[in-house]
């Protein structure tokens, strides 16, 4: 609901009518109240509602919607859904289907980026999945290595391996987790960069050949391979490194014929080197920090591009001003290993004031349901 509320805010400012979709669990959700219209799409479990593309398309047709903004999560990076929107004559506010497909596989994405001259972490990104072969690749790369699910994300399907003796068990475990989480046990093996920083570049491209970057976000503060704090600009980033990473991200976007908002994620090593990790083909959770330091409404640019217009900005227009830090607020129980903690919100005071932004999908009195991600707000 948080991202739906965010999108509705820009649509309201631009005079665009909005239609919310909601499950049984979200019947009283904030985004349902904010939208001009709301359509019920099914039971609480996501597989029976928010992941059912045909039901969402039916809701769009019934309400007369011209476009669908997928937000993040659920169907936001689903090429099949983007294709179905196109076939139904409804604009998918996101990149072309081919770009989603190209970036959907980490192995295929790395091959494409390598061909475009974007720096890659030393490793094996090919199709041979024989355990003995992968072990030999790891031995040649040198430990520690990282085994990663090719179709992975959200911290699932990743194992750090520090010695040859531990490789076989880690590989088997990683493949099992990947198969269960993504239905695909294909993995890649890469050098594990010690003391790395997770730095990502926000890019935008239109359908007229224009590509710009909106500088970087540092997302190194994580737990369980998931981001907790994000900030822009990255502390200690030199102008030379910023320019090099920005240029590499723009090349990455051009290499896949990108259009819309995208994020190119890099691993940055202490020695100044940086390596392509993946490209997220959607609006990121942490996009507000970029908006705070550039003054650019990312959702508004998405809507411009989706309607066939050119970007409203050139690279020379993008200027960094100040510093922003975002903290994700999750409904979790710290006394129970930070497990998700559903329940009713009895009191909520939203912080406000100069240079303070609070993005939320909840209000006092609402119940946090157990069916979806535990993140409820961002400060």
Please provide the spans of the model-predicted regions.
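N-terminal beta-alpha lobe that positions the nucleotide/phosphoryl donor
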Residues: 1-264, 268-287
């Amino acid at each position: 609901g948080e991202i739906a509320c965010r999108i509705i805010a820009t649509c309201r400012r631009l005079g665009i009518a909005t239609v919310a979709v909601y499950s049984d669990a979200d019947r009283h959700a904030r985004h349902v109240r904010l939208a001009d219209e709301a359509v019920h799409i099914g039971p609480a479990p996501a597989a029976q509602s928010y992941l059912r593309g045909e039901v969402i398309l039916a809701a769009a047709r019934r309400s007369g919607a011209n476009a669908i903004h997928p937000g993040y999560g659920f169907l936001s990076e689903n090429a099949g859904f983007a294709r179905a929107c196109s076939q139904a004559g409804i604009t998918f506010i996101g990149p072309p289907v081919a770009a989603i497909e190209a970036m959907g596989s980490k192995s295929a994405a790395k091959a494409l980026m390598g061909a475009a001259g974007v720096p890659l972490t030393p490793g094996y990104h090919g199709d041979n999945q024989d355990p003995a072969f992968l072990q030999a690749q790891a031995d040649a790369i040198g430990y520690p290595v990282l085994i990663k699910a090719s179709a992975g994300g959200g911290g699932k399907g990743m194992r750090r391996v520090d010695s040859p003796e531990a490789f076989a068990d880690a590989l088997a475990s990683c493949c099992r987790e990947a198969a269960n989480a993504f239905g695909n046990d294909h993995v890649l093996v890469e050098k594990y960069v010690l003391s790395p920083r997770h730095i990502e570049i926000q890019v935008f491209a239109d359908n007229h050949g224009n590509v710009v970057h909106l500088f970087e976000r540092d997302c190194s503060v994580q737990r369980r391979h998931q981001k907790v704090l994000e900030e822009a600009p990255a502390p200690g980033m030199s102008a030379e490194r910023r320019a090099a990473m920005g240029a590499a991200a723009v090349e990455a976007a051009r290499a896949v014929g990108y259009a819309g908002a995208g994020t190119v994620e890099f691993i940055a090593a202490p020695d100044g080197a940086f390596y392509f990790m993946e490209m997220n083909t959607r609006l990121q959770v942490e996009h507000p920090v970029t908006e705070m330091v550039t003054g650019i409404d990312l959702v508004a640019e998405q809507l411009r591009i989706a309607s066939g217009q050119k970007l409203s900005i050139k690279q020379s227009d993008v200027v960094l001003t100040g510093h922003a830090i975002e903290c994700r607020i999750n409904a979790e129980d710290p006394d129970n290993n930070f497990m998700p903690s559903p329940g009713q919100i009895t009191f909520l005071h939203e912080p406000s004031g100069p240079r303070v932004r609070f993005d939320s999908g909840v209000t006092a009195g609402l119940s946090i349901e157990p069916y979806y991600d535990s993140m409820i707000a961002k400060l």
